[in-house]
């Protein structure tokens, strides 16, 4: 199970704290809610003794989509919210999305599939909308998708 290999990964040309603010603003503009946040700094250290970079998991949902999914199938609620992984890498920040269904290779209940697809699409649009903003007026795109590794 590799969470980072599942979804599209983006790179933000900003330090971690600024990137998190940009991402939160873009999600809010798409009428999405960050219902929870888990600080995972130090959890994924690559080497012992090396300073760990900051990392967070933002739990993102849209109450209307969750309501729709649960109205069609009450079991659908366990697949929400969507996990947005954000981790620092020096002057850059990486962002990736992972849903519970993708993480464990599960087929979503019929009632959850449509709302989850729409939620994922809105999160992707929010992340891509940040690419239109400029970093400090220098004309540098703040976020761009990374290619396959």
Residue ranges, per PLM feature:
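Terminal, regulation- and interaction-focused segments at domain boundaries
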Residues: 1-30, 34-36, 132-136, 140-149
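A generic structural signal for alpha-helix starts
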Residues: 14-18, 64, 114
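Compact, glycine-rich, soluble single-domain proteins
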Residues: 35-82
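Beta-strand/loop substructures that line and gate deep hydrophobic ligand-binding cavities in soluble
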Residues: 82-109
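Well-ordered alpha/beta subsegment
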Residues: 106-147
